[in-house]
Amino acid sequence: IAKGLDESGKTAAQIFAENLPAQQPYALLYGPMISEEIRAGRHAFAQLGCHDLRSFETMRDCFRDVPLLMTHSCDIAGISWSVILKNVYAMAFGMADELKLGDNVRGFLVVVALQELNRIVIEMGGHSGTPYHLAGLGDLITTATSISSHHHELGRKLARGETTGITGEGPHTLKMIHQYQLFEIQQYPLFQLIHSAVQHSENVRGKFEDYFEQFFQDSQNASFTQ
């Protein structure tokens, strides 16, 4: 259930792999699992990342009396980075909602965020397509649209130009990725927009307009070269 990056920029899976005995099994549980809803008896959904089916069955039995539906994934790197990065991208939805950019923009952000997320997951050693499942798309939509979402609210604050209280997994992830240069942020324009807004929260609307213009130009250039 542990997620995020530690102060050395490592995922929980990397820490487990480096510190547990070679034959010690471990599992990672990620997906749309809002705790208040689980306590209220509502269903939640998750991917359980582990290397063997026996571990999956053991963990599934542990949650037998909880309305938590699990699927199995062997792509531990992929689900790890999907759930880590979704908190970053969720802030973009909060910014867009605060700026009243509209439902069309929200739909656009879902597509672009998943495209970038898939590319990053591949770069970080995961499998193509993993972000389109529960740990990625499922958790992103939940985090990006829930009225109780901390990261959606962070995005709203950034759009208002507020700089205090901008804390959480998303801002910490941005800091670690930048500090340790885990990947080239400039290769992912929406991710770069979010990073820029966290660093300098003035004129977030202008950042979106610049992003849309660049996206349009890139799309036009791509269509002519195909």
Where are these regions (language model features)?
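Generic structural "secondary-structure junction" signal
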Residues: 7, 36, 40, 81-83, ...
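NAD(P)-dependent Rossmann-like dehydrogenase/reductase catalytic/cofactor-binding core
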Residues: 86, 93-94, 122-226
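Glycine-rich beta-alpha junction loops
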Residues: 5, 30-36, 52, 74-79, ...
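Rossmann-like NAD(P)(H) cofactor-binding subdomain of soluble oxidoreductases
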Residues: 1-42, 59
